Design a protein with these regions (language model features):
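Extracytoplasmic/secretory soluble proteins
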Residues: 1-224
Length: 224
């Protein structure tokens, strides 16, 4: 696959080295909040909505205050060239089959936003916004704000990089704030028509071009 990435009409124009990991993000849920409210881990979109609602209005942290939300997110810088509202919402968008900016299938190639099911996603998104189950600061949060918020227990469901979630810089402050708190990684919710995705897996490539100074013999040796 890496070789095909730099091959055009039978000619190899460089080296392509794939990244080690194609996808390293998952959907996290506060396990202690589920237990506190007597809820099970959600598997469908409807179940997830019920969890988001309960996390927002049923005092999952037990502090007697109305200070939690169901879902948390932030708008990444990549949203300038990716579909809005961005990657943090793709586990929800995936329930409608419209995760990612592009539909890369040969039969339906094109922008996701033009697909009929994208409207269904927007209806669900508006439902969540109107119900107040998404932390309203998602439009202003930067990445550091978003991570500070989940470490402070502001919301109980979010998409996060596994490496960031497992980083001592992140879990140590969370553990200090919530000694009995914890997360589980769950599958993305299954939508009304059976669609499910935490987000597209796009493996990055490092490309090293071959100089014009390379002789055909050297090029053949390099290309293998």
């Amino acid at each position: 696959a890496a070789k095909n990435f730099v091959t055009y009409e039978g000619r190899i124009y460089g080296f392509a080295t794939p990244s080690a990991i194609a996808g390293n993000e998952g959907l996290l849920v506060r396990k202690d909040w589920l237990d506190k409210l007597g809820l099970k881990a959600p598997t469908t979109l409807d179940e997830l909505y019920d969890v988001l609602y309960a996390f927002t209005y049923n005092d999952p942290d037990g502090n007697g205050k109305n200070d939690t939300y169901g879902y948390g997110a932030f708008v990444e810088e990549t949203v300038s060239y990716e579909i809005y509202p961005g990657r943090r919402f793709e586990p929800l968008m995936g329930a409608f089959g419209v995760e990612g900016t592009w539909n890369m299938t040969a039969s339906n190639f094109g922008l996701r936003i033009h697909e009929a099911s994208y409207y269904d996603w927007m209806v669900f998104f508006k439902k969540c916004i109107d119900a107040g189950v998404i932390d309203p600061n998602w439009q202003s949060y930067k990445k550091d704000d978003f991570r500070a918020a989940w470490k402070q227990g502001k919301f109980g469901v979010f998409r996060e990089q596994n490496s960031a979630y497992a980083s001592e810089n992140n879990y140590s402050p969370f553990d200090a704030n919530f000694p009995n708190g914890g997360f589980i990684v769950v599958d993305a919710p299954i939508g009304p028509n059976g669609a499910q995705s935490v987000g597209p897996k796009c493996q990055g490539m490092s490309v090293y071009a071959i100089s014009d100074d390379v002789t055909p013999q050297q090029g053949a040796k390099i290309g293998g």
